[in-house]
Amino acid sequence: MNFKHKYVFLFPGLFVLIGILIFPIIFVVRLSLSGWNSYNGLNFIGLENYIRLFTDDPRFWQSFLRLSFLSVTTVILQYVIGFALAHMVWKDIKFQRFFRVLFLIPMMTTPVIMTVIWRTFFHESLGPVNDILSNFGMSPKWLTDPVLAKFTVIIVEVWQWTPFMFLLLLAGLLSLPKEPFLAAAIDGASPVRKFLYVTFPLMAPISIGAIIIRLIEASKIMDTVYVLTSGGPGTATETSSFYIFIKGLREFQMGYAASMSFTYLIIMIISLTVIAKVLTKVLLKD
């Protein structure tokens, strides 16, 4: 077969890529340069939306900082807990298969439905959490206190998506070669030293991939915030995606929402690239 003819087989995939990725991005860029809202058409206004975003909308940047905090915190906790659980069931323990399935249950549930259940759990007067804590003289305002509301969002996100991290890390642990562990056992290495000097370094490439995947997903936190707190109290848990939703689908400032979306996309691409390079340099330094 002629080498050039092989490119013919790439065309179907290329068309799909253009249809689901490139065209929407081009449309968003075009939309961001317009003043399209509930009463104006797709009229071209140049960079006015971007000027407004960078000079006259601190709320967007505050929501982005809030998103960064929530994303980084949840992913760190998911990684630590997920690695601990994966390491536990990686070893030969009783009911190993049962625990592997049990730890995956949160990921199998529908996020929106589970968030509604969590909202009921943390209800100030009707929730079982405060019913228990009231016996100790405590009644935290989980969803109406700015600090506790962030903490509640983190709890729900960690519970929902730690199983995904657990699954990736367990797959990585099961794929590790046995020879380094046998050599460490012969040398008399303790379990802690085995983990620090054998398991963790061997898992570094998988850890980097798992963290980046979860950061990408965590940076799009929307459903949890929408159902659990609606961005409140005030704007205490409002993330960038939720703020874009408000501007675009509640206030119908579609052009301005598109400019925020494109700016957000560029920032996330740059941020995740830097994070990936830093993690690679730190974890794969040897």
Regions found by a protein language model. Give the residues of each.
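A structural signal for multi-pass alpha-helical bundles of membrane permease subunits
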Residues: 2-286
